[in-house]
């Protein structure tokens, strides 16, 4: 037998038992006549004592070094009272080693487990990085999450059905990863950005509750919370309304938090997209932050200050305020830094006003813009924002999107900088009723979610006549400012689907080429259906308290979509390329 117990599982109940442990030397201490090691496996660490009573084991222990892979046979004994370590789960016991076997020695480590290592080092030697207890704990939590999800889905009548990895390229927002076909020369498969169309087809096939924990792929520019391959908890249902879908999924996430970290998330509030953008400047608001955005365009539309009056009189403009309670102590240097910060989001400046005495009107404020405001305007702004003595007001005035983005980002930064955001709290919500379409950089209409989302209370004719007025029957789940899941009611009427395609500039020929199979399937008694997908990586990130998605993926890529450990991607064998009828064209940059 190689193992009878895990190191991290030993406690007082095991005292007197003979155990066999297998794992790694985490730390070694030579005290002359005695040698102690901390022995580690995936479940934790236990102290092992080598005593002269068992001389052969003690002699062998002298050669042990960190990360040697070993086996210990010995007896669990109680630690003396003055040696109990309350910081360890196994701190009341130790193992008296009677036999020691070395499975494998370890070279000098390229990582130092007792210090911070660079991200590059950690990814290059990921198999060593994963030995660290905190990394092991994160992957164990991930396994616990998927286990809970599978049980929940099974208990609620969902079927785990796999969908293809090699599929057809369809426009879903990001670039596809393409896989060449050897048999069909010149043709390519695409790795799926999501199982979207296949899960809709499963609804058309009669499988009214589907789920899958599935890999997805997107060839896009990466951020700290993005990876080229990521994992979704993918869900689709038939004959359920949007509120019913949300109710089931909220129940799952509620149970997941209770099961994983023993936190009761309570009832999730529901907020429209419009309200979220107006009050918080984001469609994924972090409600742990008490700061809100207040519109004041109607108050300042006739002031003699074009920075305010211009956007205030522009139908596409916005003038709004963030009130920071007790923020008047913010220094001019900090204000300059905040002004520079909002510039990242396109804002041309940042007006501010300190409230030194809320009852003194203009005399009680300190601001470069005070000269443009009357007593009446000041009072109206104070009343609208509930300003108090000692507050500071920050103003955003620009095109609606620019002002909203800038103030939304500033709100988050102020919350962090001034310790207003309650970091020890959980704040979930649903955001619903998104616009059906948005303008892209060229000014063309694009689907805010994807082109298979159904509009709310619009006929195909109404949608074609007023596409920008349509509201999508879509919903996102947001927790602490992160979108952890999103979905929608799907289009199940072929006429509506063709209308959406036309609005997006996809003509009939392209519709047949790219989506002919879907349009055909919609003609054969398609049920009403709705679904959503959760990002498993992001859920795990939140539940383990890390801010980097790479910390919860066993073998992640860098922000350049590379694997430093295996050195992927790599050049292909010329013979393999020839069989695929592919030639590599070198550019001047190479």
Swiss-Prot record:
Gene Ontology MF term list: aspartate-tRNA ligase activity; ATP binding; nucleic acid binding
Region ranges (Aspartate): 196-199
Enzymatic class: ligase
GO BP: aspartyl-tRNA aminoacylation
Pfam families: GAD, tRNA-synt_2, tRNA_anti-codon
Gene Ontology cellular component terms for the protein in this record: cytoplasm
Protein name per UniProt: Aspartate--tRNA ligase
Protein source organism: Mannheimia succiniciproducens (strain KCTC 0769BP / MBEL55E)
Lineage: Bacteria, Pseudomonadati, Pseudomonadota, Gammaproteobacteria, Pasteurellales
